[in-house]
Amino acid sequence: MSLPFSQDERDLAAGGILTIDLAALRHNYSAIATRIAPTRTAAVVKADAYGLGASRVAPAFYEAGCRDFFVAHLGEAVALKPFLKPDATLYVLNGLQPGTEAACAREGILPVLNSLEQVENWAALATRLGKKLPALLQFDTGMSRLGLSAKEFDRLLENVTLLSRIDIKFAISHLANGDEPGNAVNARQLAKMTALLARLPKLPAALANSGGTFLGKTYYFDLARPGIALYGIDPERQHDFSDKVAHENKKPKHSILPVLTLSARVIQVRDVDKGATVGYGGTYVANGPMRIATIAVGYADGLFRSLSNKGAAFFGDTRLPIIGRVSMDSITLDVTSLPEGTLKLGSLVELIGPHQRLEDVARDCDTIPYEILTALGNRYARVYVYVNGGGTSTTA
């Protein structure tokens, strides 16, 4: 009978190690919650907590005081529920597909009702069960994605019976430009939200996403639902595609701590002569004798093909440029600047960490941090740690 991998064996066998700092996650939640109090602060944990593992991340937010958790799909909520205590509430942002209403009610999960059809379906179930059912009601205030349109809202107000069957816990909307403090769309959406609320019986409301929590008290209402800021990304800087600045100037503006590091293992080091081509298509040609190293991660692991011949890894303070095309399972680095013998089979290089932020990698990929974060695949060895005061405690 074979024995299961130990944690050390899993780490060694994987192409890379994704280290997630649960203490930093709790810090980020607490920092936002404290700053916007007495507004309640929820945590958005959709897409498996932005790829970091909802079953580990959501309990960390719970320990920091969070009791409200937003996911995108009902299946995500059902899967996460066993990892949270009974006083936690799960909300489904995308609402419900027809035929799933009974399961949602049975599990005690609250849907966000985004259309008149979803409202009608939820109210119909309430009628069959003979009781009001709790839900959130979303309005479209300018994003044109989810939420009741102005016409649907008018029709809803005309149907008193329909409204009477639903226990509306929050009226919500979503900011399209919350990460751009000077964008006039924010004020227009706030005005629309305020006008809609004035036409309803007094209800708790929610508007602010991560960026919205930095726009001022008028955006807070009764519940905020930050997402990307909890995961270490300053919402005002996530779209910064300018050249890298000095490392000391990269500190987040809003007391948000980075929550992850990513390292990859070297699987081969070789010397090549001038004129040697590297990778598929031979898109990189050595302009002289050089030393190259291949690492065991690729676009299947969230390091996109757009990093080909740009971007880098680090070993200590030394930048190691990516050369050639990114493959599915490997990336090649120029390591000529390191002394011979520094890197060998099994050595680790930094892809995300103190020398290179997640935002830097996203910029090199011509994308946003969300896309990189949620694409980090399940082939990494995942290590969850608590880092406090310079010390590290590792958890399985």
Swiss-Prot record:
Pathway: Amino-acid biosynthesis; D-alanine biosynthesis; D-alanine from L-alanine: step 1/1. Substrate binds at R145, M328. InterPro entries: Ala_racemase, Ala_racemase/Decarboxylase_C, Ala_racemase_C, Ala_racemase_N, Ala_racemase_pyridoxalP-BS, PLP-binding_barrel. Disulfide bonds: none annotated. GO terms for biological process: D-alanine biosynthetic process. Its cofactor is pyridoxal 5'-phosphate. The modification N6-(pyridoxal phosphate)lysine is found at K46. The active site is at K46 (proton acceptor), Y280 (proton acceptor). Gene3D superfamilies: Alanine racemase, Lyase, Ornithine Decarboxylase, Chain A, domain 1. It is an enzyme of class 5 (isomerase). The keyword Membrane does not apply. GO terms for molecular function: alanine racemase activity; pyridoxal phosphate binding. GO terms for cellular component: cytosol. SMART domains: Ala_racemase_C (SM01005). Keywords: Isomerase, Pyridoxal phosphate. It catalyses: L-alanine = D-alanine. The keyword Isomerase applies. Catalyzes the interconversion of L-alanine and D-alanine. May also act on other amino acids. Belongs to the alanine racemase family. This is Alanine racemase. It comes from Brucella abortus (strain 2308).
